[in-house]
Design a protein with these regions (language model features):
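Short, well-structured alpha-helical segments
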Residues: 178-190
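Alpha-helical transmembrane bundle of multi-pass membrane proteins
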Residues: 1-166, 170-171, 192-413
């Protein structure tokens, strides 16, 4: 809960920070928050210190969840942008998997009778192994910091700051052609110069404000379509269906594997199939699977349905979700908004997303108890309908379009 609170706080200032100081500097700051959090959790001397360390880590998560896909979008060639931004979601998925495996190994090590002396190593990795589990996050955090040191600043942000020569140099590294780089620089400058100078004035222009509202809507609606309920409460839901604790945990491992493998597939097809088609197919499959999961909980006893029925449609739901909204959401949010207010607008959408995550996390146990599992999954299915309507009616297909082309679309609305 502490990390989630920190994440909500982080997204609030991530966009403004990245718009003012640059994408690279903001990611470096987030990496420092990660590192301090991991080390702080490992050596904390009190519960209050642990809470503070977790909140700091959450702030870093919130910042990176906005700025990383934003940066990838701004340094990507249009025809590969969807694939490259989707790598962010893949990295998150693999990060979760890596954390699960690392924690499992640490727990196994601590229970194996290993002795690391009587000092702090024994405390962190054996007697109080939770310190090692939380502290290990400082390793990828420091690696992230080092990697970001060597990447270029976003060329579109550099144009916004009138650093045309530096921007041209970055475009040349991206396009490997001086002529293409010069053309992209001129197109970016043309669009930026047509924007209002005041960020808030520009954000409140009818077309741009519409894009911001749409982004926030799909961000929060996506959380109420059940994905985090499945990922957070999967074992409890499986036990509710009659599986033993061990079988429930094994089923959740299968959920995680399907999520990871499907995300890899999404990375390779998102620029070929298109963002909107993936949403149409994926969300339609989600509705079907959610209805059948609800059907199982309502009629499994009277019809004698096996537990494998539930497991199959759980996995099918995760497949449909991972190949559509999970892969597409950060791609759309990172390319929908104009350069001048991209960070600010993504912060608004990110805030909606994290608030939705928090609400679903808090409400799911209540819904499972009071609405019953059948009613809960029926509600998730109903929430898919406005999502797919918004994507169908209000969002343009952005596949293969430059960020400047997308910006012109919204400015004309």
């Amino acid at each position: 809960g502490c990390a989630l609170v920190g994440s909500i706080a982080g997204v609030l200032f991530a966009g403004k920070l990245s718009d003012r100081y640059g994408r690279k500097v903001t990611m470096l700051i987030a990496a420092l928050f990660f590192s301090v959090s991991g080390i702080g959790c490992a050596i904390t001397g009190s519960f209050d210190q642990l809470v503070i360390a977790r909140i700091l880590g959450g702030v870093g998560i919130g910042v990176v969840s906005i700025v990383s896909p934003l940066y990838i979008s701004e340094v990507s060639i249009a025809r590969y942008r969807g694939r490259l931004v989707s790598l962010y979601q893949l990295a998150v998925t693999l990060g979760f998997l890596g954390a699960y495996l690392a924690n499992y190994q640490l727990l196994h090590f601590s229970q194996s009778g290993a002795i690391l002396g009587d000092g702090w190593m024994h405390t962190i990795f054996v007697s109080e192994v939770w310190r090692g589990m939380l502290g290990l996050s400082s390793v990828p955090s420091l690696l992230f910091f080092v990697v970001v040191l060597f990447i270029p600043e976003s060329p579109r942000w550099l144009v916004l700051r009138n650093c045309d020569e530096r921007a041209l140099g970055v475009f040349q590294r991206i396009y490997l052609s001086t002529q293409e780089a010069q053309t992209q620089l001129e197109e970016t400058k043309s669009v930026v110069q047509s924007e209002a100078k005041s960020d808030w004035k520009f954000l409140l222009q009818p077309g741009i404000f519409k894009a911001v509202l749409i982004g926030a809507a799909i961000a929060i609606l996506g959380q109420f379509m059940g994905v985090n309920a499945v990922l957070y409460y999967g074992p409890s839901i499986f036990e509710e269906a009659g599986l033993s604790g061990g079988d429930a945990l094994f089923s959740q491992v299968l959920v995680g594997l399907v999520n990871a493998v499907t995300t890899v597939i999404a990375v390779f097809i998102i620029d070929k199939v298109g963002r909107k088609k993936l949403v149409y197919y994926g969300v339609s499959g989600m509705v079907l699977s959610l209805l059948l999961i609800g059907f199982y909980f309502r009629f499994s006893i009277s019809l004698g349905l096996p537990n494998n029925f539930l497991l199959f449609f759980f996995l099918f739901y995760v497949f449909c979700c991972a190949i559509s909204i999970s892969a597409v959401i950060f791609v759309l949010l990172s390319e929908m908004y104009p350069t001048r207010i991209r960070g600010m607008a993504m912060s608004i959408a990110g805030f909606a997303l994290w608030v939705g995550t928090y609400l679903v996390g808090q409400l799911t146990p209540w819904m499972l108890q009071n609405l019953t599992p059948a009613g809960t999954f029926l509600l998730f299915a109903i929430m898919c309908v406005p999502y797919i309507l918004i994507v169908w009616k209000l969002i343009p297909e952005t596949t293969g379009k430059s960020l400047e082309e997308i910006e012109r679309y919204w400015m004309k609305k």
